[in-house]
Amino acid sequence: MNPPTEAERIARGMARALAASPDDRAQAREHLARALGRDARWLTTVQRAVRQRFGAYGGEALAARHEELAGFLARRPAFLEAFENIHERPYLAGYFTFHPRMGAAPLALGGAAMPALATAGDLAAWLKLGVEELDWFAGVRVRDGRRLAEPLNHYRYQWVPKANGGMRLLEIPKRRLKQMQRRILDEILYFVPPHEAAHGFRPRHSALTHAAGHAGRAAVLRMDLRNFFVSVPARRVHALFAALGFPASVARLLTGLTCHITPKAVLREQLAARAADRGYRGYDAAAWRNWSAWFAPHLPQGAPSSPVLANLCAFNLDVRLAALAEDAGVHYTRYADDLAFSGERALARGVEGFKRIVATIAAGEGFAVNARKTHLMLRSQRQQLTGVVVNARPNVRRDDYERLKAILHNCARHGPAGQNREGLPDFRAHLAGRVAHLARLNPARGARLARSLAAIAWPD
């Protein structure tokens, strides 16, 4: 018999006994004795540790954290030492039935109607799946993300060029998994409020609201987080779902449905192609190490649930940066991976030290600042955040306006087909969205562009 495996099995039985017990030391001790077939001296130490860690001897408080309790018991020195004593060696003699329950939801949810998903069966039924099918989609059996031919791979991959050079990997879920992620987003995640400094991926907030609070400031500091989505590990996503009241087993499945391990072949092929373009065979080890985070479970950029999950998992980052900003007398907002700070001349004078503190806080929360994208913009320069000019008031960049104006003019003169150079499936809606965004920043210019948009003859 392997003691660690046996210890885990017995610890689960003890956890069930405590979950079924009233919150009373004597009755909890009686339940443990029934589970083990006899009382034991080392149970006193275990009970004391449980009370100190979970704030209860038994009952609802422990039932809601049943799996965490089992893991805690399995690691207690007094429990493990008992395996070495032939007279006190634990074994299970009695079994208590246990029905997992949802934990208490955070008060911040304001009584929102979260789905009650206490078991894997509940989650499977909610997603209209069988339990084995749920395991398949959640990647429960996956331990190696290396093979593209892996039958549990529910993603397709697309490389797109970044605006400033390099390539970005989009990990796009296939249809059925995407539908599940969308339901998790719509019926669970949208109820959870992010930090007030976060302006991306939430209702009534936008790139404009992110930028507007920084208008008319003497100094604006723009910073960027490198690889924002992949920097959010699965353990942080699991902790979020657990904090929402989902039992550990359900939180684990929800995490599996929303996180992904990139097959190494995807990255190997891209690095080999890049090396070939540069005229040498193979690829260097440093480039491979730069992609190491993709080989662990992370939020995939391309999944509908990832932006909101990343926002929520960055909550503590926002708390710390907002506190830093308040202490320094500056304003802070975040739009996805874009950080913005603004204030008076004092911010410019102390900017080097301020940047170091921001980078240290980000590193402590698992993120890295991209130093090449850090810019201090004074009032005498063009101050721009997420495409919005904020020198005096939120406004559109003149070159953005002129570029869109030229596209609309060419569409009206030569037809829209030749202007859709990116092959967008709904070019008309794309242009309408750009015009509407510009109109929010500059109504007069927006009205002129709206007239140009209306003059385009669209094919039936």
Residues covered by each model-derived region:
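Non-catalytic, polymerase-adjacent accessory regions of viral genome-replication enzymes
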Residues: 1-144
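Short amphipathic alpha-helical segments at helix boundaries and their inter-helical linkers
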Residues: 56-59, 142-159, 258-272
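Nucleic-acid processing machinery
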Residues: 106, 110-111, 117, 148-161
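Short, hydrophobic/amphipathic alpha-helical packing segments
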Residues: 117, 181, 314-318
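Glycine/proline-rich, flexible active-site/cofactor-binding loop segments
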Residues: 158-200, 272-297, 304
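Active-site-proximal segment of RNA-dependent polymerases
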Residues: 177-230, 259
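Conserved polymerase palm-domain catalytic core
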Residues: 215-335, 340-361, 365-368, 374-377, ...
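A conserved non-catalytic segment of reverse transcriptases
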Residues: 361-414
